[in-house]
């Protein structure tokens, strides 16, 4: 019996080490689609996709309080209509982030703050409960890194950290030129990446809530 317990303990420890040292850091190649499109910046599940008008984000995470777009980006935003897409990354998704479009990095800002857990969103995702963002206070509160990539159209990317994340990796900065699907960062464990871009004539959204996407490969919108 003791030998069995030791074997189980060793296998469990080995599995945990494999996940933490090998599986978590996997970085598969991706087929970057050609054409006029915006690709997913992260692997994960689409938790919301909606239009933002006058800076008002049409979701509520606490007591029906209206969220302002600038609460998510932590920086000033131009006026107008924007598409806002959220991608939740579970601990088992690939955690490498990729640029959604080609262009020049015009802006980068890191916002440090106390991190709240994302477990409510993970639970609702697993149970397929809608809306997936209910009670997800991390959307506006947690540490984050915001990028503005200016290409055919301006695209904001917001990396949002989870409770257990003490570091957001971002390997590009202001003035850098990037190509679509380029590796630009990583967030450890579970986390979230939001995507914001103008609602211009010809924009067509091709994802929906609950859909799983792959960074650099899955098309979010065409233009």
Where are these regions (language model features)?
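Contiguous, well-folded functional domains in the mature portion of proteins
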Residues: 1-223
């Amino acid at each position: 019996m003791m030998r069995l317990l030791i074997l189980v303990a060793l296998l469990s420890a080995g599995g945990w080490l494999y996940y933490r040292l090998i599986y978590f850091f996997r970085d598969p190649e991706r087929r970057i689609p050609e054409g006029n499109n915006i690709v997913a910046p992260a692997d994960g599940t689409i938790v919301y996709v909606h239009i933002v008008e006058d800076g008002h984000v049409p979701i509520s995470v606490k007591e029906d309080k209206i969220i302002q777009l600038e609460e998510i980006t932590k920086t000033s935003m131009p006026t107008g209509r924007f598409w806002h897409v959220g991608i939740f990354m579970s601990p088992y998704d690939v955690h490498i982030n990729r640029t959604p479009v080609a262009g020049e990095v015009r802006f980068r800002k890191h916002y440090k703050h106390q991190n709240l857990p994302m477990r409510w969103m993970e639970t609702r995702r697993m149970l397929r409960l809608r809306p997936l963002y209910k009670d997800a206070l991390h959307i506006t509160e947690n540490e984050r890194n915001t990028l503005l990539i200016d290409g055919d159209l301006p695209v904001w990317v917001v990396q949002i950290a989870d409770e257990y994340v003490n570091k957001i990796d971002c390997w590009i900065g202001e003035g850098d030129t990037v190509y679509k699907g380029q590796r630009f960062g990583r967030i450890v464990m579970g986390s979230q990446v939001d995507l914001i871009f103008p609602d211009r004539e010809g924009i067509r959204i091709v994802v929906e809530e609950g859909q799983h996407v792959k960074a650099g490969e899955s098309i979010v919108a065409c233009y």
